[in-house]
């Protein structure tokens, strides 16, 4: 009741303000050119010249040159700040995947065999190097380096019926018995995706609903993503485990302005056959 009464009184006050205190006639203000009049410009220049003459800077070169030198030195801190930004990024078009690296379960680190997958199944995967250790038992990747590498190398492995897959030119041998491996990173803004529709072979991004057809080379069929999901060529090693044939021939990243330029560089590395 109190709140309702307060709102009512506020409404009445607004109405009274509009009726009694605010003017009811229109006022027109003429618009003028944004630039200053020539007379005003000349007057300002005359004032500046008069100030220079009164200060005597023109007759005192030491003071003038010291002032100019001090103004030039103001740019030096900017150079120091630019150096503090750190080294320029490099290797952003690559991931840790390479020829012969095993595809492993992203939780257990267990290598994956084709027999481990059923038709319609999806497994979240990573490169085996993330689980490898050195002679001291320390993981090869750890801390910020591990997180940065995982952000680009995360993958999904799916199995479909071979007859349902329509590979594009040059990709006929990128899979094993209907098993394909794709990047887990959405090409829109980089969200990790693994919402898998078994019947349609579609992969849905939960962030902005970009949808990719994994049976059709990761093609975008809905949503804001601007390019297909990168595919990792895979085969099996001598022990029957899934391994990468190479790194991703396409850049694993959200879209950015220089992407086309960087992709051309990567195409040259892979011979342009992707």
Protein language model regions, located:
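Alpha-helical membrane-embedded segments
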Residues: 3-14, 71-82
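Short Fe-S-cluster ligation motifs
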Residues: 213-251
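N-terminal pre-ligand scaffold of iron-sulfur
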Residues: 16-47, 84-185, 191-196, 235-274
């Amino acid at each position: 009741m109190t709140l309702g009464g307060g709102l009512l009184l506020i409404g009445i006050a607004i109405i009274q303000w509009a009726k009694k205190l605010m003017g009811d006639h229109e006022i027109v203000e003429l618009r003028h050119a944004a630039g200053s009049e020539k007379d005003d410009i000349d007057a300002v220049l005359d004032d500046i010249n008069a100030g220079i003459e009164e200060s005597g800077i023109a007759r005192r070169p030491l003071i003038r040159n010291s002032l100019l030198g001090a103004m030039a030195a103001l740019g030096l801190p900017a150079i120091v700040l630019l150096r503090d930004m750190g080294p320029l990024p490099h290797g952003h078009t690559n991931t840790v995947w390479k020829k012969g690296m095993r595809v492993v379960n992203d939780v257990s680190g267990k290598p994956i065999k084709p027999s481990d997958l059923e038709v319609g199944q999806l497994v979240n995967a990573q490169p085996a190097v993330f689980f490898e250790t050195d002679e001291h038992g320390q993981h090869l990747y750890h801390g910020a380096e591990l997180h940065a590498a995982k952000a680009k190398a995360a993958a999904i492995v799916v199995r479909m019926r071979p007859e349902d897959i329509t590979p594009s030119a040059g990709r006929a041998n990128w899979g094993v018995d209907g098993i394909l491996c794709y990047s887990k990173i959405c090409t829109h803004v980089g969200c990790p995706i693994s919402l898998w529709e078994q019947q349609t072979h579609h992969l849905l991004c939960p962030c902005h609903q970009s949808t990719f057809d994994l049976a059709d080379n990761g093609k975008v069929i809905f949503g804001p993503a601007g390019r297909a999901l990168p595919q990792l060529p895979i085969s099996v090693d001598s022990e029957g485990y899934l391994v990468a044939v190479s790194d991703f021939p396409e850049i694993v990243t959200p879209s950015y302005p220089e992407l086309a330029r960087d992709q051309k560089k990567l195409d040259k590395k892979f011979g342009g056959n992707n």
